[in-house]
Every structure is written in structure tokens, then in C-alpha cells.
Amino acid sequence: MLNQKIQNPNPDELMIEIDLCYELDPYELKLDEMIEAEPEPEMIEGLPASDALTPADRYLELFEHVQSAKIFPDSKTFPDCAPKMDPLDILIRYRKVRRHRDFDLRQFVENHFWLPEVYSSEYVSNPENSLKEHIDQLWPVLTREPQDHIPWSSLLALPQSYIVPGGRFSETYYWDSYFTMLGLAESGREDLLKCMADNFAWMIENYGHIPNGNRTYYLSRSQPPVFALMVELFEEDGVRGARRYLDHLKMEYAFWMDGAESLIPNQAYRHVVRMPDGSLLNRYWDDRDTPRDESWLEDVETAKHSGRPPNEVYRDLRAGAASGWDYSSRWLRDAGRLASIRTTQFIPIDLNAFLFKLESAIANISALKGDKETETLFRQKANARRDAVNRYLWDDENGIYRDYDWRREQLALFSAAAIVPLYVGMASHEQADRLGDAVRNRLLTPGGILATEYETGEQWDKPNGWAPLQWMAIQGFKMYGDDHLGDEIAHSWLQTVNLFYQQHHKLIEKYHIAGGTPREGGGGEYPLQDGFGWTNGVVRRLISLYGEP
């Protein structure tokens, strides 16, 4: 698809006094109606049994003690530890000694668990290297080899090598990997592309979907569904033929559409919402409604300040993580307050564009295999989704795509997610032209395009720019003939990354691009991470198209 033109269109301990009271939104379903509208999901088909327990499930009160005591600066550290013995024995020992006067929780953890390996300190960048050389030399540093599953570890073993983003992220991530893959072929690493293709197909076969990442605590959710884009990339770069992945694409589609057939208008189940007119659109979802293992304390604190039932807040926080945009004003009712998060009440433009791509890919590959019936069915599904998106998510007055608040039945915020319909070929030429004007006027800066127009302190908001958004905007506008805007974003982003690299000799997760010299992007629940997989991948691909800045 690259550069192609589109031709056709203990609870008491957790309580604090707050000055907020929970007022039921008149557009929200009341609790008794909520139970009917959002029935409890069944266990995900294919989910492995005991060895897929999350650390919170496995260590119970020990887990909560460790996380609430903050013995590690990062909430993700303990979930990533591996036990040195049977977890049940550890839990029994903990229950025997925890009330001793001289009990040391940190020492107990260090005696009974292997702490996560730290890889970043092993690599020192050569300041003489060009940006391209730096990226090419980083791939081995970010590569993890297949390993036997450490008993009771949260890490899910994969059959082949894979790339991790870097920093605190020592596992592979679903949608990150697509943007990382963009650069692997340019660096001559088709071997890694093949490995990652096999890994994602394997996860679909074994779990029925691609999890957020290869950790047990990520199994209850996915991320933006980009496997169809990966398949397209594999074929373009001569890695694998698309036909071999048709069954995997269908399995992923079934995961995202689970329960759709039984819904009546204005009902939702898992990822699916049936709209008032009967059409189907999708939202982000997580099958759990507990604090995230990897951000347990942060989630508990957020829920305490919400004034809402904690399980609702936890579900929305988890769904926000599934979106990849964790977190953003896109999911907040009060843009300055994370506790107002309502992710499951929004129908996101990017998610539905990615699913349009998935439906189209299934139709196209079915046609290649001579399966006319499946081709016709999925072509109809894709067209129906596009019609529903145009009906509910297209703001004709302002010429932009926006998320849709299905509980309040109104359009939500404008963000850079609006460019995804262009990237997947779902927009008309008129929509692309009008969206281009809006992006120029509202999101474009000398350093690239902003995630949103709103400065909230969340990392997926102004003033931050992110590599995947730049790539989809560049390619999306160029595919619709707006080479000028696409090239401007490309040169601006390359300049941003290169200026920062010349000063600091590293690439990072996100950049502050709202004026002045590019610097580290802020916000989020964890310190800025360097490495960084998808920045490397996008920049390496752009260097091949535009040359080094």
C-alpha cells in the first residue's frame, strides 16, 4: 500500500474523602439495564488454563501488599518478576511471616522472585553514528530470543524471536510491532519480519486473538487490530504470501465481533455496539474490571477520585490501554481528569477504520482464493461499516472524523486518529481533502502533527507527537494525492527526531513538538522510554523514502 494512490473511493484502607459525587448520566444505562445491555463475557476461547493466571490472581494479598507499599518505583516491576519456587509455597510463606515484627517485604520479594532483567544499560550509542546507522545497530539490542517458559512467569513464551519497544517494555506489543516492522525490511532484517509474522499467527491460533502483549496480564484485551496491515506488509516485502493468513484474519475478526448477532439497537457486548439504526460499530474493551497488574496502584488511586463504582473505572482504564492511546482526552468526560475516563462509551474512529481494513483484507484474499461467497460477505461488511462511520463519526460541518459518544449520542473530540480512514482507504477524496485542511489548521506544527489539540497532561495529547501517527498521516495524505502535506509532515518529523538525536544520541517514545526545539514528550504513568521500537521503524522507513535529514 506504500505510496499508492487511491483511485476509488482491604477496601476500608482504600477509601478517602472526596468532594465528588457520582451523578448518573441521563444517557447512561442504569445498573439494572447495564446488566442486560452488557452481559458478562464468557472466558475467551482457547485461553490456557492455570499457567495463564495473572500475578494479581496468583499472589492475591501478597500482590496487593507489594504494589500498595511501592517497594518498586514502577508498578510494572513486580508483575514481571518470576517466582523462584511454586507460587503457592511463596504465598503460604508470606502468610506465615508477614505479621512478624522484623518482616521486610522488599527482602521477602528478592528472596523469592527473580527481578526482571534490565537490558538498556548494556547498550551505549556511538555518537559518531548517523541516525540510520544508529537504528540499524539497535535491532539486535531490542531483539528477544525464544525461550522456554519460566514456570509461573507472567511472560508468555513465543516460538520465534521478536522485537521489544525498549526501556520498561521487555515484551512484544501488538500494534507497536507493525510500525517497528516498517523499518526492519529497510535494515535488511527480513528474518525478523518472518519471525514476528509467525509469532502473531501463533498467538491467534493459541489465544483466539492477539493480546495487548505477551504477558498473562495482557490476555484479557487486545490492541488496535493491525494484523491485516502486517499481512499486507509481509507480502510487499516478500516475507510471506497473504493467502496463508486468511484463517488467522477470520479468527481475529470473530474475536472483535463476538456477540454481535444477538444485540438489539442501543446494546453493547464486549467490543461491539449496535447503533440505533441497527448498524454495527466497535469500541475498545477489556474482559476484566480490576486494576491493571502493571499499573495497579495508579488505577486504585484513579478510581478513588472518580465518584463512580471502581469496577467501571477499572474497565475503562483497561479499555483505554487496549486503545493504545493510554491515555488521552479522547476517553475523558472532563479533559483534565483521568478519573472521568469513559473509554467503553466511545466509538473510536481509528478502531473502526482498522476493522474496515480487516474486513477488506478478508474479502480481497478470499477473492484470490476463488471464494466468491466469502468475498461478497466481507465486502458487504466493509461497506456497511463505512456507511455507519460516515453516518455517526463524520462531522460534515467541520470536515473531520471524530469519535462518537454512543451513550450521549453525540460526536466527541477531534484527534490525529482521524487520519486512519485515509491510511486504510476508507475515506472519499472529498473527505480526505477537507480533513487535510483541518489537520493543517489544527494539528500541524513545525515538528509534525500533534496527537490532539488539548493539553491535559496525558501523554496522547498536545504537546506530544508520536511516530505511528506521523506515518499514517504521511502515507494517508499521499495516497489521496496530497503529496505536499504528506511530504511536509515527513520532513518535519525527520527533522524533529534528528535534532533530538544529535543532542542526545537516542530515539524516544514520544516528542514534545508544540513549538521550539524538539524535546522529550511528557505525561503518562511512567518515565519516558527510549529505544524505541516504533520510532525506529517509522524513521528508518522514512529515511529510505526521503533520505537522511
Swiss-Prot record:
Pfam families: Trehalase (PF01204). Pathway: Glycan degradation; trehalose degradation; D-glucose from alpha,alpha-trehalose: step 1/1. One of its GO terms (molecular function) is alpha,alpha-trehalase activity. InterPro entries: 6-hairpin_glycosidase_sf, 6hp_glycosidase-like_sf, Cyt_trehalase, Glyco_hydro_37, Glyco_hydro_37_CS. Its main location: cytoplasm. Gene3D superfamilies: 1.50.10.10. Substrate binds at R168, W175, D176, N212, R221, S222, Q223, R292, D293, E294, G324, E525. It comes from the Bacteria. GO terms for cellular component: cytoplasm. It is found in: Cytoplasm. The active site is at D326 (proton donor/acceptor), E509 (proton donor/acceptor). Its EC number is 3.2.1.28. GO terms for biological process: cellular hyperosmotic response; trehalose catabolic process. Hydrolyzes trehalose to glucose. Could be involved, in cells returning to low osmolarity conditions, in the utilization of the accumulated cytoplasmic trehalose, which was synthesized in response to high osmolarity. Belongs to the glycosyl hydrolase 37 family. This is Cytoplasmic trehalase. It comes from Escherichia fergusonii (strain ATCC 35469 / DSM 13698 / CCUG 18766 / IAM 14443 / JCM 21226 / LMG 7866 / NBRC 102419 / NCTC 12128 / CDC 0568-73). The lineage of its organism: Bacteria, Pseudomonadati, Pseudomonadota, Gammaproteobacteria, Enterobacterales. The gene is treF.
